[in-house]
């Protein structure tokens, strides 16, 4: 069993993720070994919200070069979390 805090790494802020905020869907980068049930429990525990559904995808490995050396960026799992209508997550602090 993994610690719930370690499963959700950080929210992804992209153009598509910003559009999904209007539909009450939030995008997070998660641990590769996390299951949908683990992610649901972690989001509900960390943010005190009710999760309706979770869509995940394991993004492919990307090869990178630096001169003659070839390396790779690590794979990661992206999770799109849909919340109930009356629940929100405050990702951006308002000062």
From Swiss-Prot:
Coiled-coil regions, chain positions: none
Gene Ontology CC terms: chloroplast; ribonucleoprotein complex; ribosome
One protein family per Pfam: Ribosomal_L23
Recorded GO MF terms: rRNA binding; structural constituent of ribosome
Listed GO biological process terms: translation
Keywords: Chloroplast, Plastid, Ribonucleoprotein, Ribosomal protein, RNA-binding, rRNA-binding
UniProt cross-references to InterPro entries, sorted A to Z: Nucleotide-bd_a/b_plait_sf (IPR012677), Ribosomal_uL23-like (IPR013025), Ribosomal_uL23/eL15/eS24_sf (IPR012678), Ribosomal_uL23_CS (IPR001014)
Family named by the database record: Belongs to the universal ribosomal protein uL23 family.
Record note on quaternary structure: Part of the 50S ribosomal subunit.
Name of the protein in question: Large ribosomal subunit protein uL23c
Organism: Guillardia theta
């Amino acid at each position: 069993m993994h610690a719930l805090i370690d499963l959700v790494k950080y929210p992804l802020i992209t153009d598509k993720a910003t559009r999904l905020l209007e539909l009450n869907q939030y995008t997070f980068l998660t641990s590769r070994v996390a299951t949908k049930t683990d992610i649901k429990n972690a989001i509900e525990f960390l943010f005190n919200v009710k999760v309706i559904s979770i869509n995940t995808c394991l993004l492919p490995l990307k090869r990178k070069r630096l001169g003659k050396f070839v390396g790779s960026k690590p794979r990661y799992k992206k999770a799109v979390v849909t919340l109930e209508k009356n629940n929100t997550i405050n990702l951006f602090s308002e000062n």
